[in-house]
């Protein structure tokens, strides 16, 4: 860690800004917002500085910089377009042990200014240590889009309720659940955003008067196909609020690192032909944990309602009157095809797409004549062990043996591998692939050579050494 991130209390503290141009103006806004007693030194000033001075918000010190201006100052920012002046400010500040920042010159700075997301009292600072300021700005823009504007009001509300919550709830677990409900209360957040104080107060009282929940709840969350970046925002929120996370082997390690640290983790991994934990037992685990009053997340790879047996698990909960909800995820067909450069539909190749399980019930025969029809894309989930039979059935029902096919192994991850060939080779190709793999059949596979964009190869040496 090159820099220690700290938040400074500048209310009424004497600060100096050297520079009177547009860049200095931006720094002045930050210092004024933080309540600094600001003096600005420059030979000339933008109209905005004169306006602030007229309002009594800052003091202008016209003329060249001199070390005397640093007397009794808490910090200084040098923001001129003259390198020699900025260097002099830094030198004098060091001699007088005053914190100094030189704009766009981190080597001449005892502190640097991060990109800031201001939702006071919630503050988020993003810094690259001066190495990639544009990247820091882009990250700030992404966070700005995610964090609602009323977040500050919500934090202020939380601060005002701390003592009451401490008296009302005797144990830490109850307090934590109250705070999670308060901060996740969509209608309360909307009331604050609308400045509807009366409604917000009623909603808060309802939270305090709410009787302890005898029964917990289960949230079925789709983790997506592998890349942690494909986990939905709502899915992330749920796994960070869970008391218990029940997950299988298709959930990547990267996603599991996002789970709340003190949550209990129950692994129920399954493989085709070998069920580590029987489905009925998984259903009972969900039921029992919810009956203990816990917030349970059933985390599944892909989308839980597409060959994820999510419906079966929810039926058990519904029969027992356990509250549940579903957060959909990006299914493997969508994620793997996108990361392989294979569009599932295309005006010149496929007007429909069919998602097919390679492990249908023994009495659930597939309509192979329909599957073998042209102008469509077939995606087989869990089809490796049945690949030879899939090949035989499709060719027997009229699909050309030369139809392009692709097997996507560990799709969307850094270990992704794509094996291409023709339908007549599918059974043999499957022997080269490992689970989890997805089989894509159709002429859209031929577009991969032109549309592939994702490189699954990790760099063999640090990027810094390549530069």
Swiss-Prot record:
Transmembrane intervals: none
The keyword Zinc is annotated on this UniProt entry: no
Active site residues of this protein: 248 (proton acceptor), 270 (proton donor)
Record pathway: Cofactor biosynthesis; adenosylcobalamin biosynthesis; precorrin-2 from uroporphyrinogen III: step 1/1; Cofactor biosynthesis; adenosylcobalamin biosynthesis; sirohydrochlorin from precorrin-2: step 1/1; Porphyrin-containing compound metabolism; siroheme biosynthesis; precorrin-2 from uroporphyrinogen III: step 1/1; Porphyrin-containing compound metabolism; siroheme biosynthesis; siroheme from sirohydrochlorin: step 1/1
Positions with a binding annotation for NAD(+): 22-23, 43-44
Annotated S-adenosyl-L-methionine binding sites: 225, 301-303, 306, 331-332, 382, 411
Region Uroporphyrinogen-III C-methyltransferase, annotated ranges: 216-467
Keyword field: Cobalamin biosynthesis, Lyase, Methyltransferase, Multifunctional enzyme, NAD, Oxidoreductase, Phosphoprotein, Porphyrin biosynthesis, S-adenosyl-L-methionine, Transferase
InterPro entries associated with the record: 4pyrrol_Mease (IPR000878), 4pyrrol_Methylase_sf (IPR035996), 4pyrrole_Mease_sub1 (IPR014777), 4pyrrole_Mease_sub2 (IPR014776), CobA/CysG_C (IPR006366), NAD(P)-bd_dom_sf (IPR036291), Siro_Cobalamin_biosynth (IPR050161), Sirohaem_synt_dimer_dom_sf (IPR037115)
Phosphoserine modification, residue list: 128
Span list, region Precorrin-2 dehydrogenase /sirohydrochlorin ferrochelatase: 1-204
EC id: 2.1.1.107, 1.3.1.76, 4.99.1.4
Reaction catalysed by this enzyme: uroporphyrinogen III + 2 S-adenosyl-L-methionine = precorrin-2 + 2 S-adenosyl-L-homocysteine + H(+); precorrin-2 + NAD(+) = sirohydrochlorin + NADH + 2 H(+); siroheme + 2 H(+) = sirohydrochlorin + Fe(2+)
GO molecular function, one term: NAD binding
Entries under Gene3D superfamilies matching the protein: Cobalt-precorrin-4 Transmethylase, Domain 1, Methyltransferase, Cobalt-precorrin-4 Transmethylase, Domain 2, NAD(P)-binding Rossmann-like Domain, Sirohaem synthase, dimerisation domain, Siroheme synthase, domain 2
Tagged with keyword Chaperone: no
GO BP annotations, alphabetical order: cobalamin biosynthetic process; methylation; siroheme biosynthetic process
Family under the similarity heading: In the N-terminal section; belongs to the precorrin-2 dehydrogenase / sirohydrochlorin ferrochelatase family. In the C-terminal section; belongs to the precorrin methyltransferase family.
NCBIfam families from the UniProt entry: cobA_cysG_Cterm, cysG_Nterm, PRK06136.1, PRK10637.1
Role this protein plays: Then it catalyzes the NAD-dependent ring dehydrogenation of precorrin-2 to yield sirohydrochlorin. Finally, it catalyzes the ferrochelation of sirohydrochlorin to yield siroheme.
PANTHER family the UniProt entry points to: SIROHEME SYNTHASE, SIROHEME SYNTHASE-RELATED
Protein name per its UniProtKB record: Siroheme synthase 2
């Amino acid at each position: 860690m090159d820099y220690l991130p700290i938040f400074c209390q500048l209310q009424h503290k004497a600060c100096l800004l050297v520079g009177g141009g547009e860049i200095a103006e931006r720094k002045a806004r930050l210092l004024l917002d933080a309540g600094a007693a600001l003096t600005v030194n420059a030979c000339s000033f933008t109209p905005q500085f004169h306006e602030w001075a007229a309002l009594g918000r800052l003091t202008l010190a016209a003329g060249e910089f001199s070390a005397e201006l640093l007397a009794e100052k808490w910090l200084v920012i040098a923001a001129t377009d003259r390198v020699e002046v900025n260097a002099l400010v830094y030198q004098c500040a060091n001699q007088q042990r005053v914190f100094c920042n030189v704009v766009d010159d981190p080597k001449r700075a005892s502190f640097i200014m991060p990109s800031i997301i201001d939702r006071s009292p919630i503050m988020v600072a993003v810094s690259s240590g001066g190495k990639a300021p544009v990247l820091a700005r882009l990250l700030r823009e992404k966070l700005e889009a995610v964090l609602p504007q009323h977040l500050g009001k919500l934090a202020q509300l939380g601060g005002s309720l701390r003592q009451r919550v401490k008296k009302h709830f005797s144990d830490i677990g109850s307090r934590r659940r109250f705070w999670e409900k308060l901060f996740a209360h969509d209608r309360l957040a909307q009331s604050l955003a609308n400045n509807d104080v009366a409604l917000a107060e009623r909603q808060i009282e309802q939270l305090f008067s709410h009787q302890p929940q005898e029964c917990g709840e289960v949230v079925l969350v789709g983790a997506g196909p592998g890349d942690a970046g494909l986990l939905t925002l709502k899915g992330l929120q749920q796994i960070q609020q869970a008391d218990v996370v029940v997950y299988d082997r298709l959930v990547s390690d990267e996603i599991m690192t996002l789970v709340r640290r003190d949550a209990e983790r129950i692994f129920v991994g399954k493989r085709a032909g070998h069920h580590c934990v029987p489905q009925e037992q998984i259903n009972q685990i969900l039921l029992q944990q919810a009956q203990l009053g816990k917030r349970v997340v059933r985390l599944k790879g892909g989308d839980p309602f597409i060959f994820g047996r999510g419906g079966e698990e929810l039926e058990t909960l519904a029969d027992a009157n356990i509250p549940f909800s579903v957060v959909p995820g990006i299914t493997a067909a969508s994620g793997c095809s996108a990361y392989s450069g294979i569009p599932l539909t295309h005006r010149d190749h496929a007007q429909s797409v069919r998602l097919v399980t390679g492990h249908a019930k023994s009495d659930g025969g597939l309509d192979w004549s329909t599957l073998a029809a042209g102008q469509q894309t077939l995606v087989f989930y869990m089809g490796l062990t049945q690949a030879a039979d899939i090949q035989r059935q499709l060719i027997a029902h009229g699909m050309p043996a030369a139809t392009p096919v692709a097997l996507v192994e560990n799709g969307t991850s850094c270990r992704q591998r794509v094996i291409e060939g023709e339908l007549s080779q599918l059974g043999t190709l499957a022997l080269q692939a490992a689970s989890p793999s997805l089989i894509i059949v159709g002429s859209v596979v031929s577009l991969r050579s032109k549309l592939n964009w994702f490189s699954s190869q990790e760099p063999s040496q640090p990027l810094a050494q390549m530069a």
